């Protein structure tokens, strides 16, 4: 009985620790600065690994057919009200988010560029080779796996510190300004974006809700694991 109580207590403490993470941990393969054109091989490797996992997760979410990510819902909602495609709107939204970096003093890097390239390629690979589960329960399970995969990849590439993607950079910048836990900042962003997109006519599914409420804790958990494992 004591063993079970001790286990539950330790598990509760670990949960509180990663949910309260406020900073991106530094490990031996982290770059000293985002604008680093000659990173270490290990830094570049983990950057690409993280972005690959991120793109894989995004692709799995689309393939699950359980609902798109909140930012895709926003793009879809805007596209329904203007004469542009969802893809073009996604680019415009990314540019707008990058402009929000200026007051937050966020710095781009090679990771900011590779973010779009690698994630886009992985999404296409998933859509081409990964079948959509016919069973609704399996679709939801795949959506959960997708959110966890995006969180894991996001944590790894953020620790590489070679420049975040537009949305992750916004998350990091807002965290520094507010000093709130990363899990809360990311969840706030995703829920806000999802709500605006839904109001404009975008389609929200179970996968969208899983992403909106789950990606913050998933990224925080990844940062916690990477920080503990490599230190």
Residue ranges: model-predicted function:
Residues 2-231:
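Core subunits and conserved enzymes of cellular information-processing
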């Amino acid at each position: 009985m004591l063993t079970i109580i001790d286990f539950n207590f330790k598990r509760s403490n670990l949960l509180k620790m990663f949910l309260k993470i406020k900073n991106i941990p530094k490990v031996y393969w982290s770059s000293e600065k985002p604008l680093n054109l000659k990173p270490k091989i290990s830094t570049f490797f983990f950057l690409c690994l993280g972005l690959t996992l991120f793109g894989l997760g995004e692709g799995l979410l689309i393939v699950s057919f359980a609902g798109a990510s909140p930012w895709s819902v926003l793009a879809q909602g805007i596209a329904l009200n203007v004469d542009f495609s969802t893809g073009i709107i996604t680019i415009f939204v990314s540019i707008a988010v990058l402009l929000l970096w200026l007051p937050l003093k966020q710095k781009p890097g090679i990771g900011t560029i590779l973010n779009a390239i690698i994630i886009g390629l992985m999404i296409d690979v998933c859509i081409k080779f990964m079948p959509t589960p016919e069973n609704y329960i399996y679709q939801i399970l795949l959506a959960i796996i997708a959110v966890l995969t995006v969180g894991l990849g996001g944590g790894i590439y953020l620790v590489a510190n070679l420049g975040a993607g537009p949305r992750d950079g916004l998350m990091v910048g807002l965290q520094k300004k507010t000093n709130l836990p990363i899990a809360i900042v990311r969840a706030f962003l995703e829920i806000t974006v999802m709500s605006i997109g839904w109001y404009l006519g975008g389609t929200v599914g179970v996968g969208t809700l899983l992403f909106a409420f789950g990606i913050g804790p998933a990224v925080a958990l990844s940062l916690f694991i990477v920080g503990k494992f490599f230190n």
